[in-house]
Amino acid sequence: MQNFTYWNPTKLIFGRGEVERLPEELKPYGKNVLLVYGGGSIKRSGLYDQVIEQLNKAGATVHELAGVEPNPRVSTVNKGVAICKEQNIDFLLAVGGGSVIDCTKAIAAGAKYDGDAWDIVTKKHQPKDALPFGTVLTLAATGSEMNSGSVITNWETKEKYGWGSPLVFPKFSILDPVNTFTVPKNHTIYGMVDMMSHVFEQYFHHVSNTPYQDRMCESLLRTVIETAPKLINDLENYELRETILYTGTIALNGMLSMGARGDWATHNIEHAVSAVYDIPHAGGLAILFPNWMRHTLSENPARMKQLAVRVFDVEEAGKTDEEIALEGIDKLSAFWTSLGAPNRLADYDINDEQLDTIADKAMANGTFGQFKSLNKEDVLSILKASL
C-alpha cells in the first residue's frame, strides 16, 4: 500500500424522514441561507415545500438560486457568488444531485474570493476559506455529498474541469431514499453507471497488497449489478433505492482509495467530450470506459482478469489472462447496454468531426492517468474506438 491519511468531516444523515433534522443541523451556522437547486423537480416532488418548512422552523431567511444545469456552468456559480456577497449569506443548502452540490461547492469557495470563480476551478487560485454548506440529496450518483470534489463547466470556452479543496466538504448531508423515488429511469441508470465508474477509477492501479480495497470495490460493483435490473423495473422500491443511494456515497467518499491512488483518465476524457457536446456525464462514461479498458489492458492483464473473474464471473479454464479480461470488459459493456445506457458516441450524434478538439482539451494539462499515462494519440484511439 501507499502511505495515506484519511479525513472526512461530513456528517452523513441517512434514512426516511431525516429532512426534519435540518433545523437542528443549521443551528451552528447562522440563519441567512442560500437555497441552491436545479430545474424544478424538487418542487414537483414536494421536497421543496418540505425543505422550506424546515428552514422556516429554523427561523432562516431564505434566498434562492434555481436552475443549476446538469453540467453546472461557472456563470451560474458566479450568480450564486454574487448573491452570497450581496446578501451576506451565512450558509448554503444544496437540494439536488451531484451537479447542484458541485455548483454549491464552487459558490462556497467563490464567495470568499474577490476574483472570478473560474480561477478556483482552473487552480489559478487556491481557496483559503469557504462558506459552510449542507446538502439534501435527490440522486444516487456522484458521491459529491460526502467528498470535497467538484466539476464545473465553462460553456463559453468549452472547458470542463474537476477541482477540489478540503474546505468544501459538506458540513452535513441528508440522504432519504424516498427523495429519489421520482428520479426517472434514465437518470437512475446514469447514476448507477456513474458510481460504478467511480469504483473502476479507484480499482485500476498498480499498487501491491490492497486486498481489502480490492474486495470493497468488487463488493460495491456486484451490489450495483445485482440491484440495478430490479430497480429500473421498480423505481419506488424503498430498499432498492436505499441500497443504491448508500452505494453511491461509499463509491466516492475516499474510503476505496485509501492506500492506492486510482487512475481517473476516463473521467478526464469524458469531461472533454461533454465540454464540447454537453452530453450527460455518465452517458459519456458508459461509452468510454470499456474502450479505455481495452486500450490499457496490456498494462496489467492480471488486474483486469481479477475484475472479470470476481465481478463478472468469467470462467478461466482454457483462456489466457487477456482473453478472460476482454470477456469481462464485454460483459460490462453488455450490462450497461442492457440497462439502457448508450454504448457509442453516435448515440449522441457525435461523429469524428471534433475528435481532435476533444483530444486537445483532454490534454490541456499534459499527459494524464495513473494506470497508463495517456498522450494525445492514446486519447484519439479511445475516442475513435468509441464512435
UniProtKB/Swiss-Prot annotation:
CDD domains associated with the record: BDH (cd08187)
Top-rank lineage group of the source organism: Bacteria
GO biological process, one term: 1-butanol biosynthetic process
GO CC aspect terms: cytosol
Documented EC number(s): 1.1.1.-
Protein name as annotated: Probable NADH-dependent butanol dehydrogenase 1
Keywords for this protein: NAD, Oxidoreductase
Cross-referenced InterPro entries: ADH_Fe/GldA (IPR001670), ADH_Fe_C (IPR056798), ADH_Fe_CS (IPR018211), BDH-like (IPR044731)
Pathway in which the depicted protein is active: Alcohol metabolism; butanol biosynthesis
Family statement drawn from the similarity comment of this UniProt entry: Belongs to the iron-containing alcohol dehydrogenase family.
The UniProt record lists the keyword Oxidoreductase: yes
Gene Ontology MF term list: alcohol dehydrogenase (NADP+) activity; butanol dehydrogenase (NAD+) activity; metal ion binding; methylglyoxal reductase (NADPH) (acetol producing) activity
